[in-house]
A protein has these predicted regions:
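N-terminal membrane-anchoring/stem segments of glycan-assembly enzymes
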Residues: 1-12, 65, 69
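Cell-envelope/extracellular polymer assembly enzymes that use nucleotide-activated donors
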Residues: 15-17, 49
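Short, well-formed alpha-helical segments that are part of the catalytic scaffolds
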Residues: 25-39
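Short, acidic, metal-binding catalytic loop of nucleotide-sugar glycosyltransferases
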Residues: 35-47, 122
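A conserved acidic beta->alpha catalytic loop
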Residues: 53-61, 78
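Long helical/loop segments within the catalytic core of UDP-sugar-dependent glycosyltransferases
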Residues: 73-95, 109-191
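Short aromatic/hydrophobic "clamp" motif used to bind/position activated sugar donors
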Residues: 98
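The conserved acidic donor/metal-binding loop of glycosyltransferases
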Residues: 102-106
Length: 192
């Protein structure tokens, strides 16, 4: 299932909340992800609202978020794991679109420019109270690429010789599944 990428005028791009979920990841690893998110391209950068969603409520992560000029939502009790972490953030944000990233993911600079256009007409119809009678897009899931070794690579000391298992799954297996109407949704992956 493929869609033709819509051409959208720059002034039509809506606000988007970028949520980075973290649970005990090292602040040094988080720095790379947060920093990359701040460099994502968008026609009006004031419409991109980046938040670190920390379900362990760590002071050093709140400080890092502040240093990088992004928002921070701490969750003290880790209630409902990652979904609880995201729900906590969603109760405090209001953009019509949400992009999610795991703590160990670095988005491409063009991530928002390549995903948001598919939603613009729907967002405008919703905001104007109009009916939207075209095919609707509810979620765009992009291939998952980590910059740290997965558990198999790490345990086999083969970070440089084996492909990342998650990378292989999202770029090969899930693409095949999608072509047969059976793609899997994986929370935290790079979504809008």
């Amino acid at each position: 299932f493929e869609l033709e990428e819509p051409e959208i005028a720059k002034e039509r791009y809506p606000d988007v909340d970028v949520l980075i979920a973290t649970h005990n990841e090292d602040p040094e690893l988080l720095y790379k992800t947060i920093n990359a998110c701040t460099f994502m391209e968008y026609p009006d950068k004031s419409k991109v609202h980046i938040y670190v969603c920390d379900d362990t409520n760590r002071l050093e992560v709140a400080k890092l978020a502040d240093e990088l000029g992004v928002g921070y939502f701490g969750l003290a009790d880790n209630k409902d794991a990652k979904s609880g972490n995201y729900n906590n953030a969603l109760r405090q944000t209001s953009s019509p679109l949400v992009a999610t990233f795991d703590a160990d993911m670095i988005p491409y600079r063009e991530f928002l420019l390549e995903t948001v256009p598919y939603f613009v007409e729907q967002v405008e119809a919703y905001e104007n109270g109009d009916d939207y009678d075209k095919s609707k897009v509810g979620l765009i899931q992009t291939p998952q690429s980590f910059y740290n070794a997965d558990i198999f690579q790490f345990n086999l000391f083969s970070e440089s010789t084996l492909p990342n298992e998650q990378d292989f799954f999202s770029k090969e297996i899930n693409v095949f599944n999608n072509s047969h109407g059976a793609a899997l949704y994986k929370i935290g992956r790079a979504h809008v």
